[in-house]
Amino acid sequence: MSYYFKNLKPDLNSDVEEDDGNLLESIMANKSKREIDEQESSDDELKTLSFGSLKKAETIIDEEDFKDTKPVHKKPITTTYREESFDEDDDSEDKSDEDAGFFEEDSEDETHHGQKVPKKKSKHAPIEQSSKKRVPRVRNIPGLEIPRNKRSNLYQDIRFDKSTGKALDSSIIRKRYQFLDEYREKEIDELQKLLQDRKFLSKIDQGEREEMEQRLKSMKSRLQSMKNKDLEREILKEYESDMNKNNNTRYHLKKSEKRKVVQKWKFDHMKAKQREKVMERKRKKRLGKEFKQFEFHNRR
């Protein structure tokens, strides 16, 4: 029952206005007493709280105010950072339900926005690479890759490397490095002297001796082939210069014609015994071809 009905007294003959005024005064007095009692009780509760709990409550309120006023960043906050903040504020979450609800909302937003969805600008755009990633020391430069069939040959001549530019003419390269023939001849002479020395041969085994002989043979054949190419180049140069003396337009020989010119020059400058050997070799070769064309060779 309300306070108004409790204070009603039976058999009162006073005026209604006076009763109403007294009633209002009594209500206001009771209300002021109640407020004073509540203030005293709240002060007593604050006195019983420790400084640590008051400090935690103050930090929570400051964080809430800072997050309300903080501008929204485009970059989302990672979930690991939020988990660390949970560990720090475990006590405050247990005490207040409001704080727990606040952190739950933040975690939901982070899980929603935490995953970065890659977006492609254009299909014709160049490849993007992070500047934070270290560049490897060994890189595949486009245009300089070694094909698979030539990867076994690791040691290549730098004169024919693609990085130096276009491939030059072999005649120009030969002129530049023709002085190396002297070193090759000296090396061949030294190797021949070693193979003729009996003391040196007694110190090495049979395998090393065969290897040295094979190397000497290959060096001689390589040097001879270089000299033969130089001779053929000079022959063709003289022939073309004689042919184009009185011509306004320069005429160049085909490969088949070049081969015939070189063979003719060599045959003319051979000795009699060498010519006989060459003619005998060609005759045997021709007879062998004719013999293979007989009918009994085609039987199965």
Swiss-Prot record:
Coiled coil spans: 203-232
Keywords: Coiled coil, Nucleus, Phosphoprotein, Ribonucleoprotein, Ribosome biogenesis, rRNA processing
GO biological process: maturation of SSU-rRNA from tricistronic rRNA transcript (SSU-rRNA, 5.8S rRNA, LSU-rRNA)
Listed InterPro entries: RRP36
Pfam families tied to this protein: RRP36 (PF06102)
Chain intervals for the UniProt region annotation (Disordered): 60-146
Subcellular location per the Swiss-Prot or TrEMBL entry: Nucleus, Nucleolus
Cellular component, GO, one term: 90S preribosome
Ribonucleoprotein is among the record's keywords: yes
Disulphide bridges, residue numbers: none
Compositionally skewed regions (Basic residues) per UniProt: 114-124
Acidic residues: bias regions: 85-109
Residues modified to Phosphoserine: S14, S41, S42
Subunit structure: Associates with 90S and pre-40S pre-ribosomal particles. Interacts with CKA1, CKA2, CKB1, CKB2, PWP2, UTP15, UTP17 and UTP22.
Function comment: Component of the 90S pre-ribosome involved in the maturation of rRNAs. Required for early cleavages of the pre-RNAs in the 40S ribosomal subunit maturation pathway.
Family label: Belongs to the RRP36 family.
Protein name from the UniProt record: rRNA biogenesis protein RRP36
Species in which this protein is naturally found: Saccharomyces cerevisiae (strain RM11-1a)
Gene for this chain: RRP36
